[in-house]
Amino acid sequence: MAYRGWRRNGTKYNATKCVVDGIEFASKREANRYLELRLLERAKEISDLRLQVDFELIPNQYATEKRYGKNGQPLKDKQVLLERKVVYRADFVYTDKDGKTVVEDTKGFRTTEYVLKRKMFLYKYGFPITEI
């Protein structure tokens, strides 16, 4: 039998994408958590529920490039992008009864990239990410 390669079924971590209220979620777990949080918001247990909120962990890194005209006259310096910013995208962000901001992430598998971003988030914003 000839080798035909391997074929991946589904997503990278075997999550099933779902659509709830016209919103596409990466997994059933995330969709179910959204439904729970929506009920809590209706019951006034939480407020200001937001989805897929970006938090900047490291800003863009620029270098200044000196420029000169044809006759040697200095021109306005140009900013050159060296590295793009690092962003953590939270699944859910809301405010609890005590007025505290809660950042939630539904995780089935913790990647090394996620663990590093979680640590950078704690360092920069001063409160942890809640994992569901």
Where are these regions (language model features)?
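Electrostatic, structured charged patches in enzyme active sites and in nucleic-acid/phosphate-binding
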Residues: 1-132
